[in-house]
Amino acid sequence: MLDPAASTARQRVAELVRQLLAKRGIDRAPSAEDDLGESGLSSLDIVNLMLAVESEFDLKIPERDMRPANFRSIARIEALVASLMDQSTPVGG
């Protein structure tokens, strides 16, 4: 897990994306609005990103929110995380 005190939600999501891209041999950081599929992430990578977001932010993404549109860009993931954090308590607590 990344240090939550050291970074914003967008930075934390961007780092998760960067790590997934690096595993695919892609050394570039997409902007907040870049399409992650076009940046090099596969559909399996997006599923892994969903799991990583749940772990990083200690939350559960409801099935209704597991839509490709919510994971199209770093900005959209950040918005989803903010929405979920506003309406729920952490999984561990």
Label every PLM stretch briefly.
Residues 2-41, 45-51, 55-93:
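Phosphopantetheine-dependent thiolation modules in NRPS/PKS and related acyl-activating systems
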